[in-house]
Amino acid sequence: MKLKSKLLLSCLALSTVFVATTIANAPTHQIEVAQRGMI
């Protein structure tokens, strides 16, 4: 159980970092497309 929560937390952290870098590097229209893809 502990391993699963650690894995989940790592995945969450990775996706947060990925989204943050994408937003930092991408022009506005790409961000809008990414947000639509998440919904």
UniProtKB/Swiss-Prot annotation:
One of its GO terms (cellular component) is cytoplasm. Pfam families: PhrC_PhrF. Its main location: secreted. Contains a predicted signal peptide cleavage site in the N-terminal region, however the propeptide is probably subject to only one processing event, at the N-terminal end of the mature peptide. Disruption phenotype: Deletion of the gene results in decreased expression of genes activated by ComA, including rapA and the srfA operon. It significantly changes the expression of 72 operons. One of its GO terms (biological process) is establishment of competence for transformation. InterPro entries: PhrC_PhrF (IPR025899). The keyword Cytoplasm applies. Keywords: Competence, Cytoplasm, Secreted. The keyword Cytoplasm applies. It is found in: Secreted; Cytoplasm. Induction: Part of the rapF-phrF operon, which is controlled by ComA. Transcription of phrF is also regulated by the sigma-H factor. Residues 1-34 form a propeptide. Interacts with RapF and inhibits its interaction with ComA. Signaling molecule involved in the regulation of genetic competence development. Secreted during production, but the mature peptide acts intracellularly, indicating that it needs to be imported into the cell to function. Stimulates expression of the genes controlled by ComA, a transcriptional factor that regulates the development of genetic competence. Acts by inhibiting RapF, which regulates the activity of ComA. Belongs to the Phr family. RapF and PhrF pair of proteins acts synergistically with RapC and CSF in the overall regulation of the ComA transcription factor. CSF, PhrF and PhrK stimulate ComA-dependent gene expression to different levels and are all required for full expression of genes activated by ComA. This is RapF inhibitor. The gene is phrF.
